[in-house]
Amino acid sequence: MRSIRQWVAVLALALPAAFLAPAGPSTAAPTAANADAVTSPTARLHLGAADLPETRTVTQLAPGVTQTSITRGGPDSSLFWTAEVAIPSSSPDPDAPASALSDQTHAQFVAARLRAAGVQARVEHVQSPQLADAGGDLGYRVRAGQFGTKADGTDTVSLITAAGYSSSVLYTGWDGDSASTDQSRGPWKLEVVTIDPKQFSGELTSSFGADIENPETTSQLAGQSGALAATNGGFFVLDPKAGAPGDPAGAAVYQGRVLSEAVGDRPSLVIDGKKNQSSVQRLTWYGSISRQGDQGQNQLALNGTDRVPGLIRNCGNDADDTPTALPLHDVTCTDANETVAFTPEFGSSTPSGPGLEVVLDSKDTVTAVNSVRGISVPKGGRTLQAIGSGVDKLRAVAQVGTTLKITTELINEQGTPLKTKPSTNVVNGGPLLLSGGVENITAKRDGMVHPNDGNSFYYGWVHKRNPRTIAGVDAQGRTLLVTADGRQTTALGLSIKETADVAQSLGMVDALNLDGGGSTTMAINGQVVNTPSDATGQRPVGDALLVLPRRKD
């Protein structure tokens, strides 16, 4: 077994401001036990108060691959548990949902009613850090009580419920309020894997496991491949009502094969495994079906690949989708008239139901036309499913014996198709965090601002601290994969603004947010090294980023 070299660098409790956030990476000094210098990320994180203690443990996993474990800050006696009230909507729409936030007048009205019921409620103004296209004044929240433990808030929640409101108990350390984040004391726990393409002789890649429709844990995916290191990857379908669980909810390419369409033009991590290099790119989808040799005549739109027709997780597909054609995170858009392609990678059987399913061989020649959906995809071939008005359109071009031309492409920002080869992998993400070394957090563009919800989704997903997974590239061309634990009193997590700050502190010049929350996981040599936030432990995920000790080609 490969020997592991390790050392700990304990940083001073306070440093002059000029040394807190150097622009580029630094090199950790080797100890006597380790004569070979191992490159580590930059010396300190721009996270919380400037005087926080920070400890780093750097482990060399292989030549050109390091793991850096970072702890920053410590227990903060000013933090506590509190009850947060779901404020009923002031909209005339009787179906309008309650929200964590409201305008000041309505929040004060709710607080007054609670105080009349014996609840010591308070109103707090929520100011969020300004991002490239979102943030600022989010509204007002209503909270009650200060508790030493979550369980201590039970009686207050009961009083709030009796007064006719819903509430939950949460930890104030998870707030991302702009007035307090730069004075936060932590604690934070992060893991960083750095891959240097100039030294690493293995392969950076991604994998969904045995098939797309059955998610697996990050450590399972790492173990199957013998990965040195792995993190969870992109967003994916969790709920069967939103599609096939495990299906990437955004662009995905595995070993050069395009197996999921993009969400609008959200950013993705594009990996060249042959060179062990990666880049952050905005990609859009283009799909079409026509008869071979028709030169564009009778061309049909192909709406996607390897997902349930009619269900578009995170939206951002086309103008016919409801409620929007734009990206809308954690929302499932619908379209009753779609055509979707399926590959053998999808799973044991394609989605069943009414519609049409066309079976193609390895040369895309039609071998069967079925009047219902749901079959096994032939080895080396694929199928096309149509629903709604797509049925007659597909039937018109796909007769048995006809050879079709099927295009499935991801288009880059230059308007040209992404060139793929067997070493190409793409993992979806969002929002964008950094561009050219500058923070450029495009939360609204990438679908994290929900219309007409009183900023409630933004408040919980962007503004508040959560577990996060980050991927990016530094000025030296190294790829960095980062996890930050959260939803714990011993690890607060990061707001999206703090996520970008951390990426920049680590020397990244281009970076994006990957799937986080309960999905955030890092495994080293098959063993989980962070603390996933789900009560059940590791969450099965759609795909994972893998650092393999040897090349597959």
PLM features: what roles do these ranges have?
Residues R2-W7, P16-F19, A23-D553:
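Gly/Ser/Thr/Pro-rich low-complexity, intrinsically disordered segments
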Residues L13:
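Nucleotide/phosphate-binding catalytic cleft detector across ATP-hydrolyzing
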